[in-house]
């Protein structure tokens, strides 16, 4: 019975947020977001991937970008990327088969550190 009440409470929480949460959101809604952080990450990752030979869709407002898989099986490409400690998500999970998705809402240093690994990954698929 207690478990059922807990589930009902969580479900109702989605319908009617707790008062404290409503007050916090009301204050945050007026706050400005500094987008320069995300813009720098987007530009660095986008340009870095293009220099490696990857074809990318430049996002206009998202915190992730889609990269064209260099092979037909984007899931196999995601697996290959893991060998370089790169985590990609198959685009088919988001209705974009043939692409992989990568988020850039991470520390700038993480993106800078990942670019050499993307270069190594690209060597498997592109002739220079």
Give the ranges of each region predicted by the language model.
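PLP-dependent class I/II
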Residues: 1-128
């Amino acid at each position: 019975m207690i478990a059922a009440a807990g589930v009902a409470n969580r479900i109702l929480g989605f319908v009617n947020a707790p008062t404290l949460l409503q007050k916090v959101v009301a204050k945050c809604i007026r706050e400005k977001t500094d987008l320069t952080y995300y813009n720098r990450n987007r530009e660095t990752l986008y340009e870095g991937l293009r220099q490696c030979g990857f074809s990318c869709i430049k996002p206009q407002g998202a915190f992730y970008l889609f990269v064209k898989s260099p092979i037909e099986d984007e899931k196999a490409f995601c697996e290959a990327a893991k060998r370089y400690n790169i985590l990609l998500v198959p685009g088919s999970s988001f209705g974009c088969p043939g692409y992989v998705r990568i988020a850039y809402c991470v520390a700038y240093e993480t993106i800078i550190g990942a670019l050499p690994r993307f270069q190594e990954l690209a060597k498997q698929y592109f002739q220079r």
